[in-house]
Design a protein with these regions (language model features):
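Short, well-ordered turn and helix-capping elements at secondary-structure junctions
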Residues: 3-5, 128, 272
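C-terminal catalytic domains of large/alpha subunits in multi-subunit enzymes
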Residues: 19-269
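Conserved short loop/turn motifs at secondary-structure junctions
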Residues: 5-6, 61
Length: 277
């Protein structure tokens, strides 16, 4: 399977292989994924904007459906029956009706026979686009521990529930959600950029620009409220961006509760929190 999507940690190589394998009723071990080669990869608008699974995944689903149809048609031709009389189980095409009932031909034989003529290639190219991307939804709740003297704060627990349609791969969806939540917490509580009056960047290394590690945050719990998106591949929709949006307001609300008054989301650093407290 040759795809244009780039796996930047989104897990799309695995997820797109799963979609193809589901349609073709085979193991993901039987799907070889070739992606992100600008010499030979097909065009893809990019792995961003919450669109990889929803848009590219749908292209893969449609492509696999067409390939399956061609396999069934070619298998029926070899058996000598109508395409409407055959089924495909991932390994062979079998006739289920008529005078050839019970006859079958293996996928290996179909592949070999398809190379002996040029009337039907078992190779499919498909594109898919969508003017919209159905929004995912998420709710997040933060428990924040605050030092009332210094203003230092730490997220003790963060609970999230995500509606990303039907997760194609729940494990990958969960770790992507955890990573996005951690990034959102860092943007809210520790990451900052300031300049001198001469335009010099103060946070010019990771000693000053403090990205939180997994050790800096308490427990992150992610659950899924599965729905079914009719326009998505097997009911899936996006998850990549929504998970970074909730930590900032959740942490801000927690600190506001601790301070007993509203705290601006732009003032979550320790000295600012201490002043608010």
């Amino acid at each position: 399977m040759n795809i244009g999507a780039a796996d930047m940690g989104t897990g799309c190589d695995t997820i797109l292989a799963q979609i193809a394998a589901e349609v073709l009723e085979c193991s993901t071990d039987d799907i070889s994924v070739f992606g992100a080669d600008t010499d030979i990869s097909p065009y893809d608008s990019g792995s961003y904007a919450s669109s990889t699974t929803y848009v590219t995944g749908k292209a893969v689903e449609n492509c696999a459906l067409e390939l399956r149809s061609r396999i069934e048609k070619f298998g029926a031709k070899l058996i000598g029956c109508d395409k409407s009389d055959v089924t495909f189980d991932g390994s062979c095409v079998r006739c289920e009706a008529g005078e050839h009932n019970g006859a079958s031909v293996s996928l290996c034989d179909i592949a070999t026979a398809s190379m002996c003529g040029n009337d039907m290639a078992l190779s499919v190219t498909n594109t898919h686009t969508s003017p919209i991307s159905p929004p995912p939804f998420m709710v997040g709740a933060a428990e924040v521990e605050v030092d009332l003297v210094t203003g230092e704060s730490r997220v003790v627990e963060y609970d999230a529930c995500v509606d990303c349609g039907t997760p194609v791969n729940p494990n990958l969806a969960r770790v992507q959600a955890e990573g996005g939540i951690l990034q959102g917490i860092g943007m809210a509580m520790s990451e900052n950029i300031t300049y001198s009056d001469k335009g010099k960047l103060y946070e010019n290394s990771f000693l000053q620009y403090k990205i939180p590690s997994r050790m800096d945050i308490g427990h992150i719990n992610v659950e899924f409220e599965s729905s079914f998106e009719n326009a998505g591949p097997f009911g899936a929709k996006s998850i990549g961006e929504v998970v970074i949006n909730t930590p900032l307001p959740a942490v801000t609300d927690a600190l506001s509760h601790a301070a007993g008054k509203p705290v601006s989301y732009t003032h979550l650093r320790a000295h600012e929190t201490a002043a608010n407290l």
